[in-house]
Every structure is written in C-alpha cells, then in structure tokens.
C-alpha cells in the first residue's frame, strides 16, 4: 500500500471541539485556584518581612513562594492557549459545515477522493491541536489522556473481486476498491474522545497503573505539588538532634548542618512515630528530605519518555503472562493474578536497565523478604521475555 493510503487508514478520529470544551472548563476551574494562590503569596511575602525567623522557616517560605509563583505563571500562560488554537478551531468548524456526504448508491471515485481529502484535513488539524497541548504544562494531562486515541489501525479489507489487494479508499466503516469501485464492509476499531468514559475495566486498570507510575517518577524527583505540614519538619529536626545526626556547630549552612542525614534516616523517623497522619507522607520522602536538607533530588527527566514506553511494554507482557489467561496456569509458566508489581520496584529496575546510577535505599519497596523474592521472580521473568538487563540489588 502506498504511503498516501496508509496515512488515511492509520489515523483515528478525535473530536477536538469536545476536547476544547473540556479544556475551557479546566481553565475556568484553575482560575479559581489562582485566586487562592495569589492570596497565599501575599501572606507569604508578609511573613518574609518579619524579623527573627529561623533560617529553616525562611527557606520553607521561599520554597512555597517559588512554587506559588510558578503555578501562577503557568496558569497565566493558559491565556495564550485560546489565541494559539483559535485558527485551528475555526478551520475545524468550517470543515464540519462543509462535510462531504456521499450518495448511498454507487459513489463516484471523485466523490470518494473529495471525502478522503476532507477527512485528511480534519485529521491534520486534530494533530496540530494535540501538538499545541505540549506547550502548556497545565494541559499535559489532556495530552496524555488523548494519546491512546491517535493512530489506531483499522481492519484491512479482503482482496477485491477484480484482484486488487492493496489500493483501497477507506471510510469509517467501508472500503472502496480504487480500481473497480466495488464497496466492502470495513469493521472499524477507532475510538473518539467520548469513548474515554466508556473504557472497559482492563483499560481502566492499565490507565491507573500508568498514572500511578507517572506519579512514582514525579515523587522520585521530588517534583510533586504536595503540601507538607510544618510540624513534620519540626518533628524531624527534634528527632535528628536527639539521635546526634545533625552538625550543631554555629554558622553552618543548611547543607552542612544536614549533610549526614539520608532519606532512609528520615523515613525511619517517620515510621517510628507510628501515626496514620504521618504515614500518608511516606511517598513524599524525597521531597521532605530535599526541603529539610537542601540535598539535590535525582533528575531523570531525560529518561521519562523512555521509562513510560518501557512501562507500557512491561504492562502488556505482564497481562499476557499473568492476567489474560483462560486457565490458571499455561505452558509459559504464568499464574493468573490480578495485582501488578510494586511501582517503585519497577522504577528501580527500569532505571538500572538504562544504566542510570541510583541507590536502592531511596526506593520504597516491599517489607517482607518473601514478597521481595516473589516480585524478583515475576520481574525477572518479564525482563527475560523482553530481553532486558535485570538487577537483583534492591533492598
């Protein structure tokens, strides 16, 4: 099949007008949040003008101020979004008003070609619209949500009675031979934006896994927008002093004062407290440690796309081996199970696969040795199938 026909056959429709409406609703909601952030920023600036604040409190306030300012700037950038996509929306509306309707019986080749060209123009606008989302940090979730709606191949028609096997002009639900104009039914596997709310449970689990893994990547770099109560830092500082883990010489910088403090130490202290209110911050340990000690977080931004691609492959292999089975055990040695492997366990293994240096102690993995061995067994098998390098060195 020529490149021309392949392009037409390999793209699925996306209703960017509905997506645009969803984005407008999101921007309206965010506008209310910005009012709250601006009020918070005023209070922070007032506090910073006070005298005799402890250095750690000043540092914390400056961090909060920086985060608020960043979020406000990112929101104000959304003011340019409507201007940026206005011409695309207008062209899309015009194409909708000039929709090509084929006669029910025996459409001519010219009519089919006109309809195909019309669809190509719409799909080109859809791609341009989705590419615009990449320029706006606040709209990344919309870009991620729509990825699965693009480039979904349709079923290929059987050979035509005239002998043609490749030259077809395809519509949503039919294919017409470009040589003799014979029409065939075509089962379409496309999805639209409205289909997002009607995905089956398997797709829901897959989506939730990936969202959870993305959160894990964000938390590992300490980039999540989570508010950590000031009491947490006060408790940590008190406990670290009790354990003689702080350098108490006068005049030291924050980095020097906390240079002996590791993430594992901070996590151990939080666990010692045994409080349910504290337990919910375990996943934020990197952010807490960085804010407290000013020690830098690991930056894996350059690997994020590769990690997400690897995760997709790993998930698909896992489902084929352990979930999508008719019988409890099959010839590949899989055992049907529902739960996926620990996200931080997976992140560590994928970072090691890409030869990224990282400390296994920085990952919240599994408590019991039996569970660790079980995860190693599963993960090693998946990596072996995918022919990836596997590492055992994780706590």
Curated annotation (Swiss-Prot):
Keywords: Activator, Transcription, Transcription regulation. Signal peptide: none annotated. Belongs to the IIV-6 282R family. Coiled coil: none annotated. This is Putative transcription factor 079L. Transcription activation. It comes from Invertebrate iridescent virus 3. InterPro entries: Poxvirus_VLTF3 (IPR007031). One of its GO terms (biological process) is regulation of viral transcription. Pfam families: Pox_VLTF3.
């Amino acid at each position: 099949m020529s490149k021309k026909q392949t392009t037409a056959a390999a793209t699925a429709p996306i209703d960017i007008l509905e997506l645009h409406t969803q984005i407008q609703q999101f921007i309206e909601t965010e506008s209310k949040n910005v009012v709250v952030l601006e009020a918070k920023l005023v209070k922070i600036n007032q506090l910073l003008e006070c005298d005799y604040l402890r250095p750690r409190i000043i540092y914390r306030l400056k961090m909060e101020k920086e985060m608020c300012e960043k979020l406000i700037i990112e929101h104000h950038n959304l003011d340019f979004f409507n201007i940026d996509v206005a011409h695309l929306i207008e062209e899309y509306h015009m194409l909708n008003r000039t929709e090509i309707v084929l006669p029910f019986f025996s459409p001519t080749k010219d009519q089919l070609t006109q309809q195909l060209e019309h669809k190509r123009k719409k799909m080109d606008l859809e791609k341009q619209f989705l590419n615009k989302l990449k320029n706006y940090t606040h709209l990344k979730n919309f870009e991620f949500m729509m990825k699965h709606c693009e480039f979904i191949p349709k079923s290929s028609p059987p050979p035509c009675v005239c002998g043609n096997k490749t030259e077809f002009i395809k519509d949503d639900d039919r294919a017409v031979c470009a040589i003799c104009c014979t029409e065939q039914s075509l089962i379409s596997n496309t999805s639209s934006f409205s289909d997002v709310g009607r995905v089956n449970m398997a797709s829901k689990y897959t989506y939730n896994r990936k969202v959870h893994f993305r959160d894990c990547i964000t938390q590992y770099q300490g980039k999540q927008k989570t508010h950590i109560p000031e009491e947490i830092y006060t408790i940590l500082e008190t406990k670290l002093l009790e354990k003689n883990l702080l350098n108490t010489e006068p005049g030291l910088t924050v980095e020097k004062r906390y240079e002996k403090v590791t993430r594992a130490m901070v996590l151990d202290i939080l666990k010692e407290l045994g409080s349910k209110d504290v337990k919910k911050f375990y996943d934020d340990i990197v952010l807490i440690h960085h804010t407290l000690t000013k020690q830098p977080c690991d930056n894996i931004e350059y690997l994020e796309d590769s990690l997400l691609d690897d995760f997709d492959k790993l998930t698909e292999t896992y489902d084929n081996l352990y979930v999508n089975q008719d019988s409890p055990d099959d010839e590949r040695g899989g055992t049907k199970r529902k739960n996926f492997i620990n996200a931080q366990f997976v992140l560590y293994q994928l970072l090691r696969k890409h030869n990224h240096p990282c400390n296994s102690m920085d990952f919240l993995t599994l408590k019991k040795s039996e569970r660790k061995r079980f995860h190693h067994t599963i993960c090693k098998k998946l990596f072996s199938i995918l022919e990836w390098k596997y590492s055992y060195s994780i706590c």
